[in-house]
Regions:
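Loop/turn elements at helix/coil->beta-strand transitions in domains of secreted/extracellular proteins
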Residues: 57, 105, 158-161, 182, ...
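Metallo-beta-lactamase
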Residues: 3-158, 188-240, 259-263, 284-305
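Active-site environment of divalent metal-dependent phosphoester hydrolases
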Residues: 70, 168-174, 193-194, 245-249, ...
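Cap/insert and terminal regions of metallo-dependent hydrolase folds
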Residues: 129-154, 256-316
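Active-site neighborhood of phospho(di)ester-bond hydrolases with catalytic His/Asp-centered motifs
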Residues: 108-110, 159-167, 187-188, 240-243, ...
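Active-site beta-strand termini and strand-to-loop segments that position acidic
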Residues: 99-103, 232-233, 252-256
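Active-site metal-binding motif and surrounding structural segment of the metallo-beta-lactamase
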Residues: 125-186
Length: 316
């Protein structure tokens, strides 16, 4: 455990130095031209009413590859429950959720991996800084042929109009190069930070349609935090869940079988059930992560009929 406590700060330093080097060598990261996402008035103002009115919307979860690591490294290092966490390397799924709406068509939540992870294992299309970060933490990635995002979408005959991101970490954005130039990318307003761009900006090369969700004026819908009715019809909700990153988003799909996608507000079931928040960039982020996690846990207790899919564990 002592070695791990040393390695992670060192890896974070490597990531920061790598990001700065890339910034200087490449003349700076291109600035995303970001348009505020047009948020319509909500169809409902409480979750009882939302869930009492399921919508004609469907979802399918896809695994686009596997991340093998000590999953406990993703969690609050100061938590006393770390001693109970199984630190043996395990497989975490790189998940994408395909959602179909009768009016707004097909879209994704997160982008997973493109086929570079099968062609160039174990780091695929990650930046040099992220490859060093993975190596320092003993993280490897793998993918079976045909498991990549583009291959699965082709088999499903799906052409997504947009991707809604839980957050800007590369294991959630590495499938973006496989998507068309006209695809829209939607994320929390604070996600386009320097460090986020350092980790993922290469994935968005040639893309131009960026939209940010601003939760500052969104109503809190107890027991969750600020929540946005994305299409204004009660079918698809973006829920502010910061901590792991500054503007992490969870999503609720209000289908006949409703599902809450926690994103990396909770990476896997043990952490959710044990009340251990994800690690943030700093202690303040981790503290915010506990607030978000407890809101999600309270929602799960209040609405046990809602299926929970974690950031890297879906039971598929």
């Amino acid at each position: 455990m002592k070695l791990k406590k040393i390695l992670l700060p060192a890896a974070l330093l490597i990531l920061a130095i790598g990001a700065l080097a890339a910034y200087l060598v490449r003349g700076g990261f291109r600035q995303f031209e970001i348009t505020p996402y047009p948020v319509p008035p909500p169809a409902f103002t409480n979750w009882n009413d939302v869930l009492a009115h399921p919508r004609d919307i469907s979802w399918t979860t896809l695994r686009t590859g596997v991340i093998r690591m000590d999953a406990c490294l993703n969690l609050d290092p100061a938590s006393p429950r770390q001693a109970d966490c199984d630190h043996a390397p395990r497989d975490l799924a790189a998940l994408v959720h395909w959602v179909h709406h009768p009016r707004f068509g097909d879209f994704l939540v997160d982008a997973g991996f493109d086929d570079s992870f099968a062609k160039h294992p174990p780091y695929g299309n990650y930046t040099e800084a992220m490859q060093l970060f993975n190596w320092a933490n003993g993280v490897t990635n793998r993918q079976e042929p045909g498991e990549d995002l583009a291959a699965q979408l082709a088999r499903l005959h799906v052409h997504p109009n947009a991707v809604f991101f839980t957050h800007f970490h590369p294991d959630h954005t590495a499938g973006v190069p496989a998507l068309g130039r006209e695809t829209e990318f939607v994320f929390g307003k604070a996600e386009a930070s320097f460090l986020a761009r350092a980790a993922v900006s290469g994935h968005f090369s040639g893309k131009s349609k960026f939209f940010s969700i601003d939760f500052s004026a969104a109503p809190a819908m107890a027991p969750l935090g600020p929540s946005v009715d994305v299409f204004g019809d009660g079918s698809f909700w973006a829920i502010s869940a910061p901590g792991h990153t500054d503007d992490d988003i969870a999503f609720l799909i209000n289908a006949t079988t409703p599902v809450l996608l926690t994103g990396d507000a909770s990476h896997f079931a043990w952490a959710f059930q044990s009340g251990v928040a994800p690690r943030g960039w700093n202690s303040a982020g981790t503290a915010r992560g506990y607030v978000s996690l407890e809101q999600l846990r309270a929602f799960a207790r209040a609405y046990p009929s809602v299926k929970i899919i974690y950031g890297h564990e879906a039971g598929i």
